[in-house]
Swiss-Prot record:
This is D-erythrose-4-phosphate dehydrogenase. The active site is at C155. Belongs to the glyceraldehyde-3-phosphate dehydrogenase family. Epd subfamily. NCBIfam families: E4PD_g-proteo, PRK13535.1. It holds the Pfam family Gp_dh_C. NAD(+) binds at R12, I13, N318. Pathway: Cofactor biosynthesis; pyridoxine 5'-phosphate biosynthesis; pyridoxine 5'-phosphate from D-erythrose 4-phosphate: step 1/5. Keywords: Cytoplasm, NAD, Oxidoreductase, Pyridoxine biosynthesis. The record marks H182 as: Activates thiol group during catalysis. One of its GO terms (cellular component) is cytoplasm. One of its GO terms (biological process) is pyridoxine biosynthetic process.
Length: 338
């Protein structure tokens, strides 16, 4: 059975989801029926075809009136600001992938269901009252048929949660800190401009900019036992894609660098294959652009202090890796039943 999806919001993640679907060869499993985006159709088609981070899309793209043609496929374009007015029932939508970055509450999810969708997957963290928050590879197997409003967490949560789980099971985590070194995002100005967050009034290309992050809360959402045991900070850096995460954890078992790297390498080749990758090469951020993994462990940067303090550096393409997990979670939601 082919899952019929709609994409609500055709920005960085929405376009990456569509491109990832075509590039990953999963069109027999998932079909994009419609896209709802307030921007004009000509701009939607242009930005799908030409992308500053991911290059030119390999499929032929053209737009006519309210239709987007991708290869031989026809996708309906909608420009409806009110979720309750979307024609999901008429179009037979199984799952809405809400990539707007605006919606994320249970009420928002229920509005999509009222419009006729069977299930909703938010491409960002949602409220505590959602049916589930999924980090694919860690807890997607817990999805049930009555989980109709689901969050796919965040790109950074998807990156770091598998590593935390692996280190905790092997060595027993007592507490930890996380520093996210994140590429610039579209909530930052090209030149100085007004913003509620005074640090984000500054030009994105000119500074390393500390910003707020809810990553610690995201860790606790997946692993409640770590409540008040993790803290996180985040800085934005003048690159347009790819993020690095510096994870430090104190553990109960004595350990050395070789043991940590062996554990993570084994997981990348085994239980987390396709989700976690592992590199021993002297790479830089641009080398991980367009990488579909949630996390890539840089073993050259693993450190252990006093046998009980572990520091790891983990890379991710915060757009492409997350977009691929959106597709994985969509299929997992479908497998759990409607």
């Amino acid at each position: 059975m082919t899952i019929r999806i709609a994409i609500n919001g055709f920005g960085r993640i929405g376009r990456s989801v569509l491109r990832a679907l075509y590039e990953s060869g999963r069109r027999a499993e998932i079909s994009v029926v419609a896209i709802n985006e307030l921007a004009n159709a000509e701009g939607m088609a242009h930005l799908l075809k030409y992308d500053s981070s991911h290059g030119r899309f390999a499929w032929d793209v053209r737009q006519e009136c309210d239709k987007l043609y991708v290869g031989d496929d026809i996708i309906r374009l909608i420009h409806q600001p009110e979720i309750e007015q979307l024609p999901w029932g008429e179009l037979g939508i199984d799952v809405v992938l809400d990539c707007s970055g605006v919606y994320g509450s249970r009420a928002d999810g229920e509005a999509h269901l009222t419009s006729g969708a069977k299930k909703v997957l938010f491409a960002h963290p949602g409220g505590h009252d959602l049916d589930a928050t999924v980090v694919y590879g860690v807890n997607h197997q817990d999805l049930q048929a009555d989980h109709r409003i689901v969050s796919n967490a965040s790109c950074t949560t998807n990156c770091i949660i598998p590593i935390i789980q692996l280190l905790d099971v092997a060595f027993g985590i007592e507490s930890g800190t996380v520093t996210t070194i994140h590429s610039s995002m579209n909530d930052q100005p090209v030149i100085d401009a007004y913003h509620q967050d005074l640090r984000r009034t500054r030009a994105a290309s000119q500074s390393i900019i500390p910003v707020d992050t809810k990553l610690a809360a995201g860790i606790t959402r997946i692993f409640p036992k770590f409540c008040d045991r993790f803290e996180a900070i985040s800085v934005r850096v003048p690159t347009i894609n790819v993020t690095a995460i510096d994870l430090s954890v104190s553990v109960t078992s004595p350990v050395d660098v070789a043991e940590v790297n062996q554990l993570l390498q084994k997981a990348a080749r085994g239980s987390f294959r396709g989700i976690v990758d592992y590199t021993e090469l002297p790479l830089v951020s641009t080398d991980f652009n367009h990488d579909p993994h949630s996390a890539i462990v840089d073993c050259t940067q693993t450190r252990v202090s006093g046998q009980h303090l572990i520091k790891t550096l983990v890379w991710c393409d915060n757009e492409w890796g997350f977009a691929n997990r959106m597709l994985d979670t969509t299929l997992a939601m479908a497998r759990s039943g409607f």
